[in-house]
């Protein structure tokens, strides 16, 4: 933001402890902007909120007093999970999954007619050894839902073994779905 003064009125940076340190529910973060309009609007909310809960403040302080080892370990773990998930997904016939570079989820194109329909079928009609999976149809993440009609968003927040099992379930589900609906 500082490097591009011509964009300063149109730039907003938002960060939060809940995202940076996986502190679900901790409502501590920051908003950085040079826009007076955005700043004034944010201050209305900030002043109404007063302050975050004490335990959240203590946890956030502790998180900032580390040497970076925690962040490195988390980054390494998510990179490992991402690589496993992307490799396993791309090994399924008809699945295309680019490697994401900055998130903890991937968007994969599936060999189905409609991922909304497929996701519902997974939850209501499919099980492999009494297990199923849930995927998020990607259409809702696009301004034009048709762009994501054959895509799903899959988070890689599970442990490695659970990720592997989930992909095995997906692989079998895709085969059965394509047979059932003659795709």
Task: Give each language-model segment a name.
Residues 1-183:
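PLP-dependent class I/II
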């Amino acid at each position: 933001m500082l490097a591009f003064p011509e964009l300063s009125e149109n730039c907003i940076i938002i960060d939060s402890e809940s995202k940076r340190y996986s502190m679900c529910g901790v409502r501590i973060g920051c908003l950085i902007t040079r826009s007076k309009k955005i700043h004034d609007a944010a201050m209305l909310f900030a002043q109404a909120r007063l302050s975050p809960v004490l335990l959240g403040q203590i946890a956030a302080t502790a998180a900032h007093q580390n040497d970076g080892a925690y962040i490195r370990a988390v980054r390494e773990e998510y990179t490992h999970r991402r690589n496993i998930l992307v490799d396993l997904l791309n090994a399924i016939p008809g699945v295309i999954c680019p490697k994401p570079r900055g998130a903890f989820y991937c968007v994969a194109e599936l060999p189905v007619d409609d991922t909304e329909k497929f996701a519902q079928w997974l939850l209501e009609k499919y099980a492999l050894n009494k297990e199923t999976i849930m995927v998020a149809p990607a259409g809702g993440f696009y301004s034009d839902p048709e762009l994501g009609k054959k895509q799903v968003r899959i988070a890689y927040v599970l442990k490695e073994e659970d990720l592997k099992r989930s992909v095995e379930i997906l692989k079998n589900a895709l085969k059965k779905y394509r047979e059932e609906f003659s795709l």
